[in-house]
Amino acid sequence: MKYLTISIMIILALALAACGGKSEIVGTTWQWEAFQDTAEVNDLTVPDPENYTLTLNEDGTASIQADCNQVTWTYELDGSQLSFDTTGPATLAMCAEDSLDTQYLERLGATATFVLEDGTLYLNLWADAGNLVFGSP
């Protein structure tokens, strides 16, 4: 039931976001806090959000910290649609075995749309595969 409510809020927020000008999500460093699985099976709370950040820069680049790695992608933002070009440079450090770096980057690269609600950023993945939930410090 909570996902139905979240889905309705996301749809309403998408409609409102499409009406806006420059997006409020640009220029903020967001910390990945959780993954919400639409099937409610693989929900995940990120134990150390400060190690998984996303900053959408004014110049169209995305600065990403994926635990022990730094990544730079480009992004396209059109209304509530958000997509990443995942071919940018990245460090290739070997993170700890329990790191979420690979999951984070794979899911981030599958972003389709976003919703900003009450200071929380939701990145909605393609094919209704779930949502990445971000807060700002």
Question: Which residues are covered by each model-predicted region?
Answer:
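Lipid interaction determinants
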Residues: 5-9, 14, 19-137
